[in-house]
A protein has these predicted regions:
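Sec-dependent N-terminal signal peptides
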Residues: 4-13
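Sec/Tat signal peptide C-region and signal peptidase I cleavage site
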Residues: 15-19
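Active-site-adjacent core segments of small-molecule enzymes
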Residues: 20-507
Length: 507
């Protein structure tokens, strides 16, 4: 009898002795058997009253949320930004208005077109998104590794993505489809030129630069506006893979970028990026041979100085990928006082689309997910929904509306948005007049080394050479020729066109 009691005591102490926790249902009740369903007899059938089985299957059935329509494959990390230059004369944004000021942040790097399980060796732009947890709310810079984009107007974005995604018929990404689209979008020439260099396949996320792509507005305490564009410069250097290196890497480990980033942080080789800004006064915005608020245009450093304002350090890996990376909700509309959107047509569409896709993907309460919560207490009149604030925060809990004779919450007029005066402006629907689609891709091409030019031509030939429609090929070559004569001639020759053919359609 003593032996039986002793065994019972040991069994009862088992979870404590070996540091194991008792498994529970979602309601917190302990589970007796997680290996066998409740059945009629030894062989079944299974009883519907097996609540644990039903709950377990129901939870599993709903595990997968919609993946991002673009930027589905990604990696994330946490760290901080430390300012090194006081920019308060340009912006009242709290993270930029002092020296040696630290702001916690989260970062998500990503590929763009393919799904969550796709290789990180594909030629693709890379997403470079940073969420700053400031004392005045969350501020997101949602950009890419390249300083420009394919299009300048958000109305083209769904069509562009459709062309780059796999065919709805064959489920295969097809150069015939996306070059058909781009042959009718000359503004894409700049982005295509950059993407088909080795920049299109970064060696790892920590080895790529980043850009806000768009210009934004900085606003200071006096309400004065300055246009700003951000650049992240990797302190690890910018390193990429050519075709052979990418093929070799893919044969060994096609998720190398995620693994490399995580290993560096685990090994305390913390990746860093310096943050630079370029500034343009509103009175100077029209003085360039391009429109600076056109997302297909870079801001040349020899014309618009790059000013270092701080450094980002990543020093912490996610503990739970789904909760901290898959669930992070980035948006260029997450702005704080001192930073406002510009008139950039592509940016204007993104301000809506990012918030909208997060509501679809993560639900109405996505900003209450821990990784998306601001440090600043959220206090507003959202009521009776997942997005509502707790009324216990209010001096008058009964008041959830404005205006009211009982002041529960108040605004601060110092945070009002800047004003813009417009004269002789009409509402219209047409493309901008200052397109200048070929000057910058030409300048970029001429800045390349001979090796980089050779790789660019080879990479373009690989995809453009698959296009069956000769007229599409000719239109693309025409764009490259108009950018730079040598560029056009070399790709024409690579695709098998004669000098006579080339000179005829290259004019």
């Amino acid at each position: 009898m003593k032996k039986i009691v002793l065994i019972a005591i040991v069994i009862g102490m088992w979870p404590t002795l070996y540091g194991q926790q008792i498994m529970t249902t979602n309601g917190g009740a302990p589970i007796g058997d997680n290996q066998n369903s409740k059945t009629v007899g030894e062989y079944g059938p299974v009883l519907l009253e097996d609540i644990h089985l039903i709950e377990k299957l129901a939870a599993f059935d709903r595990e997968r949320i919609p993946e991002r329509v673009v930027h589905a494959r990604g990696a994330g990390a946490f760290g901080y930004f430390e300012s090194t230059k006081d920019m308060s004369s340009y912006t009242k944004a709290v993270l930029f208005n002092g020296n040696n000021k630290r702001t916690d942040l989260a970062v998500r790097f990503s590929t763009v077109i393919h799904g969550k399980g796709s290789p990180e060796t594909a030629r693709d732009p890379r997403g470079f998104a940073v969420k700053f947890y400031t004392q005045q709310g969350n501020y997101d810079i949602v950009g890419n590794n390249l300083p420009i984009f394919f299009i300048r107007d958000a109305i083209k974005f769904p069509d562009m993505v459709h062309s780059l995604k796999p065919s709805p018929v064959t489920n295969k990404q097809d150069p015939n489809r996306f070059f058909d689209f781009f042959s009718n979008v000359p503004e894409a020439t700049h982005m295509i030129t950059r993407l088909y260099t080795d920049l299109g396949i970064p060696k790892g996320y920590q080895y790529m630069n980043g850009s806000s792509v768009h210009g934004f507005k900085w606003v200071n305490e006096n309400g004065e506006v300055t246009y700003v564009k951000y650049s992240w410069i990797s302190k690890q250097g910018e390193h990429n893979l050519d075709l052979e290196q990418a093929a070799k890497q893919q044969s060994v480990d096609w998720q190398h970028a995620t693994v490399s980033l995580r290993m560096d942080i685990d090994n305390k080789n913390y990746p860093q990026w310096d943050l630079y800004v370029q500034l343009i006064k509103p009175k100077d915005i029209g003085s360039f041979d391009f429109w600076p608020l056109d997302a297909t245009k870079d801001w040349p450093a020899d014309k618009i100085e790059k000013i270092k304002i701080g450094t980002m350090t990543l020093n912490k890996n996610p503990v739970n990928y789904f909760q901290e990376v898959e669930s992070i909700a980035m948006s260029p509309g997450n702005l704080i006082p001192g930073i406002e959107p510009s008139e950039d047509k592509l940016l204007q569409g993104r301000l809506f689309s990012y918030f909208d896709t997060q509501r679809h993907r993560l639900g109405a309460n996505n900003q209450q997910i821990k990784v998306n919560q601001p440090k600043k207490e959220v206090v507003n009149y959202n009521s009776d929904s997942y997005s509502s604030a707790s009324n216990s925060k209010f001096p008058n809990a009964d008041i959830n509306y404005q205006p009211s004779t009982k002041v529960a919450l108040k605004e601060n007029s110092s945070y009002k948005l800047s004003e813009t005066k417009l004269n002789n402006i009409k509402i219209t629907q047409k493309k901008i007049s200052k397109t200048n689609d070929f000057a910058q891709p030409g300048s970029f091409y001429r800045s390349l080394s001979e090796k980089d030019k050779t790789n660019l031509i080879r990479n373009l030939k690989g995809d453009l050479g698959q296009v069956k429609n000769i007229h599409i090929q000719k239109k693309m070559i025409t764009y490259f020729y108009r950018s730079d004569r040598d560029f056009g001639m070399r790709i024409a020759k690579a695709l098998g066109f004669s000098q006579k053919d080339f000179m005829q359609f290259g004019k």
